[in-house]
């Protein structure tokens, strides 16, 4: 009996072991614990954006911990490694959310708890509408949607971290609102300049919109700040020079804005989104040539980059509509990229404009001096706000910053440009109606800023080479304009469409070498080491030995030859300096240049609108027309310059040349 009681006592004690006051059991039942996480993600919007972190917890018992996603985000998707806690969070495209929450479960196999991961999403609310950056057919506020795929392909360059950081871009324009909420952080106020009052604030003084502010927004609107859209080179440094302000456009100011002043002498890229008001084929102006030539000395001798808009006179040239009647009827350009002497020479990169469907913008000038084309859009109106509009009026424009203050505007034309009724532009500080080659130029300037960040050693000619090599053949099936309507059934080609030259480059007077591709250009710039040797040039003169009357109403034409034997082999540019004694009107004339390889470039097509207040221009004096169509071809050999007169004999005087009308051909190359 005694032994039985002892055994019972042991049994009772065993049953009592591990009760509520036992510390060992309390420790075993505690779950893993750790701090919540607060993370931040810059949302690219044009490509997947991802962050990586680690959920760090500990278990009181030192037991293994298992991780899992209990509740995923609504803007993005999280994954986690089940044993290490390595967390990845991805937003696939744009999101309107500024915050997302993910719950991570942690378990030791006995108990579990949650860790809250809060992600602040830094976005730009208008970026899905900015088709020029990334075009998936999303609304740009116009009635017509963009056609998916027609964009500058910036995504790859941005994903690699190229943002324009460290590159200085001058906006040579009407002004620049330096306090704009989406520009201020990128503006170098100390190196900006106001030509009207000598201050460093080029913000416009008079009421109204500001062209330069919109241009600056395309280049360098600030990213990831929850405001507006995004610039192509969203970390570039912007400077404003209000050369185009009323009363500021002197030759001295022009030079100072382009590198001749201390505040502009260290600029990398000059953006010139302007055109001449002249409707004539002008003589070259040596003073402008000298200013452009000075830019060659900048960037430590590598040359600053001059980006110039190609002009907006395809169907309207000056204030006399009649000068464009024939050009419009035959579908050729009334104006030309050659109508502004400030675009002269081999330095400027002249850019045309492309619409959101990948074809030439309705207004964009054609010309042999174009280098590439970039998005310029159309007019951005919406019939919900402006009934009765159609065609290019309701096709997408470019979305960018605009001068703040609704008192500067008077019309509602779409849901963004709605006098402050849009929460996205309550102060009218953003627009969806910016267009023109004025928009194409800053788009290209932004891409070049990305290229220079990728490779600061690029010279200006290296930049041009890379752009030509990487441009896309947009509107690839375009065949040009050939008609039998001019010469009583005889076929005449006024525009050749796409032509492949003897060096393998495709070229078009509508698009230059094609549409700029940011990712391809930056990829090429990164690995570029075969820098072009010094540029050389050769020139030759030719003239008719006696008075030459060009055959009228004929494809026979009159021809001059130039025998070129330069020390260099490959052509970069060809420039003709032209003189013509008399013409019934330059609209009758076509001028073509043919290389030794047989490539033809139309320097000036017939039916152009060259005139003076509606009166046809009837002579040419020392005018320079540049062609890029021969890029990479062999320079040596016989070049031919051909002049035509397609007007009937009943129209005015004959096209004629005197022996003193000297024609010059200048080739540059390496």
Protein language model annotation of sequence segments:
Residues 526-670:
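Loop and turn regions of beta-sandwich accessory domains that flank beta-strands and are enriched
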Residues 137-179, 190-228, 241-254, 277, ...:
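Active-site-proximal loop motif in hydrolases
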Residues 123, 240, 267-274, 303, ...:
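C-terminal subdomain of the subtilisin-like protease fold in secreted/lumenal serine endopeptidases
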Residues 163-165, 210, 222-226, 240-345, ...:
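Substrate-binding/access-modulating region of protease and related hydrolase catalytic domains
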Residues 173, 331-449:
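Extracellular S/T/G-rich loop segment that most often corresponds to the catalytic His/Ser-adjacent loop
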Residues 157, 172-182, 209, 213-235, ...:
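Flexible, small-residue-rich helix->loop connector segments that border functional cores
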Residues 49-90, 115-119, 587:
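Surface-exposed or secretory-pathway low-complexity segments enriched in glycine-proline
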Residues 29-66, 70, 554-556:
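Extracellular ectodomain surface segments
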């Amino acid at each position: 009996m005694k032994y039985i009681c002892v055994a019972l006592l042991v049994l009772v004690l065993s049953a009592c072991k591990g009760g509520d006051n036992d510390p060992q059991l309390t420790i075993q039942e505690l779950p893993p614990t750790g701090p919540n996480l607060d993370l931040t993600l810059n949302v690219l919007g044009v490509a997947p954006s991802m962050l990586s972190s680690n959920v760090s917890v500990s278990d009181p018992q030192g037991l293994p911990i298992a991780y899992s996603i209990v509740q995923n985000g609504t803007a993005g998707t999280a994954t986690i490694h089940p044993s290490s806690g390595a967390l990845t969070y991805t937003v696939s495209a744009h999101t309107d959310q500024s915050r997302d929450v993910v719950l991570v479960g942690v378990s030791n196999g006995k108990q579990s708890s949650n860790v809250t991961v809060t992600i602040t999403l830094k976005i730009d609310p208008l970026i899905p509408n900015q088709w020029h950056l990334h075009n998936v057919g999303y609304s740009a506020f116009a009635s017509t949607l963009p056609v998916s795929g027609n964009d500058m392909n910036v995504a790859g360059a941005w994903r690699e971290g190229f943002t324009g950081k460290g590159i200085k871009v001058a906006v040579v324009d009407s002004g620049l609102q330096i306090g704009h909420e989406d520009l201020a952080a990128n503006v170098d106020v100390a190196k900006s300049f106001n030509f009207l009052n000598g201050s460093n604030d080029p913000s416009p003084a008079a009421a109204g919109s500001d062209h330069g502010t919109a241009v600056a927004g395309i280049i360098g609107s600030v990213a990831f700040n929850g405001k507006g859209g995004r610039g192509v080179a969203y970390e570039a440094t912007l400077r404003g020079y209000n050369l185009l302000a009323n009363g500021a456009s002197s030759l001295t100011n022009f030079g100072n804005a382009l590198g001749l002043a201390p505040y502009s002498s260290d600029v990398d890229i000059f953006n010139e989104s302007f055109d001449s008001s002249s409707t004539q084929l002008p003589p070259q102006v040596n003073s402008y040539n000298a200013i452009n030539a000075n830019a060659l000395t900048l960037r430590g001798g590598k040359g600053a980059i001059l980006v110039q808009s190609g002009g907006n006179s395809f169907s309207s040239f000056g204030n006399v509509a009649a000068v464009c009647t024939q050009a419009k009827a035959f579908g050729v350009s009334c104006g030309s990229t050659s109508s502004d002497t400030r675009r002269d020479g081999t330095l400027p990169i002249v850019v045309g404009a492309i619409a959101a469907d990948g074809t030439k913008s309705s207004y964009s000038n054609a010309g042999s001096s174009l280098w590439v084309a970039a998005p310029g859009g159309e007019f951005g109106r919406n019939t919900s706000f402006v009934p009765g509009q159609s065609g290019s009026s309701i096709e997408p424009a470019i979305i960018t910053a605009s001068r703040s203050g609704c008192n500067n505007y008077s019309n509602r034309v779409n849901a963004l440009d709605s006098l402050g009724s849009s929460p996205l532009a309550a102060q009218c500080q953003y627009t969806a109606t910016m267009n023109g080659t004025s928009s194409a130029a800053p788009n290209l300037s932004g891409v070049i800023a990305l290229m220079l960040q990728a490779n600061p050693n690029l010279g200006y000619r290296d930049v041009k080479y890379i752009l030509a090599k990487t441009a896309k053949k947009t509107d690839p099936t375009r065949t040009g304009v050939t008609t039998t309507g001019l010469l009583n059934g005889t076929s005449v080609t006024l525009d050749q469409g796409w032509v492949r030259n003897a060096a393998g480059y495709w070229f078009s007077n509508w698009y230059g070498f094609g549409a700029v591709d940011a990712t391809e250009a930056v990829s090429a710039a990164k690995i570029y080491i075969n820098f072009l040797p010094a540029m050389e040039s050769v020139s030759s003169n030719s003239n008719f030995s006696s008075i030459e009357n060009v055959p009228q109403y004929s494809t026979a034409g009159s021809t001059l030859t130039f025998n070129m034997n330069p020390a260099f082999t490959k052509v970069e540019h060809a420039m003709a300096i032209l003189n013509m004694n008399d013409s019934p009107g330059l609209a009758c004339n076509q001028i073509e240049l043919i290389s030794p390889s047989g490539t033809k470039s139309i320097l000036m097509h017939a039916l152009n609108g060259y005139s003076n207040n509606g009166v046809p221009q009837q002579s040419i004096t020392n005018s320079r027309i540049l062609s890029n169509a021969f890029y990479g071809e062999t320079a040596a050999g016989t070049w031919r310059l051909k002049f035509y007169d397609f007007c009937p004999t009943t129209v005015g005087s004959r096209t004629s040349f005197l022996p003193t009308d000297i024609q010059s051909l200048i080739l540059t190359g390496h």
